[in-house]
């Protein structure tokens, strides 16, 4: 299935017009370009990867997945998630906000008796 976007002003949108994406059965949302080259998003992400990520039609769902996935790190929905520290908490807060403001509510993680 091929998706075309009207905005032609940016290189990013020009890229997406030519990307052949498969629709997932679960969400009926196209897979992002990150599925074709995952190492580019998990190592040190470059500016082009961030730009592609921020224009992805799956961005809001990706933001929710990042917040709900334990141990998520790297580039998710255009936001870099560090391994640990305050920067990680800040990035996850940004992703939660992106997801929820765009119609993808984030499930709160339950605290187990062992981790409490």
From Swiss-Prot:
Cofactor: [4Fe-4S] cluster
Cofactor note: Binds 1 [4Fe-4S] cluster per subunit. Contains 1 [2Fe-2S] cluster after reconstitution of overexpressed protein from E.coli. Following nitrosylation of the [4Fe-4S] cluster binds 1 [4Fe-8(NO)] cluster per subunit.
Disulfide-linked positions: none
Stated name of the protein: Probable transcriptional regulator WhiB6
PTM characteristics: The Fe-S cluster can be nitrosylated by nitric oxide (NO). Upon Fe-S cluster removal intramolecular disulfide bonds are formed.
Similarity comment: Belongs to the WhiB family.
Domain 4Fe-4S Wbl-type as annotated: residue spans: 33-86
A cellular-component GO term for this protein: cytoplasm
MF terms (GO), sorted A to Z: 4 iron, 4 sulfur cluster binding; dinitrosyl-iron complex binding; DNA binding; metal ion binding
HAMAP family in alphabetical order: WhiB
Key words of the record: 4Fe-4S, Cytoplasm, Disulfide bond, DNA-binding, Iron, Iron-sulfur, Metal-binding, Transcription, Transcription regulation
One Pfam family cited in the UniProt record for this chain: Whib
Annotated binding of [4Fe-4S] cluster, by residue: 12, 53, 56, 62
Role noted for this protein: Acts as a transcriptional regulator. Probably redox-responsive. The apo- but not holo-form probably binds DNA. The apo-form has been shown to act as a protein disulfide reductase.
Compartment(s) where it occurs, according to its Swiss-Prot or TrEMBL record: Cytoplasm
InterPro entries given in the database record: 4FE4S_WBL, Whib
Main location: cytoplasm
One GO process term, biological-process aspect: regulation of DNA-templated transcription
Conditions for induction: Weakly expressed in exponential phase, more induced upon entry into stationary phase. 3-fold induced by streptomycin and pH 4.5, 4-fold by ethanol. Slightly induced during entry into hypoxia, by cAMP, in macrophage infection and 5-fold induced by NO. Repressed by WhiB4.
Domain of life: Bacteria
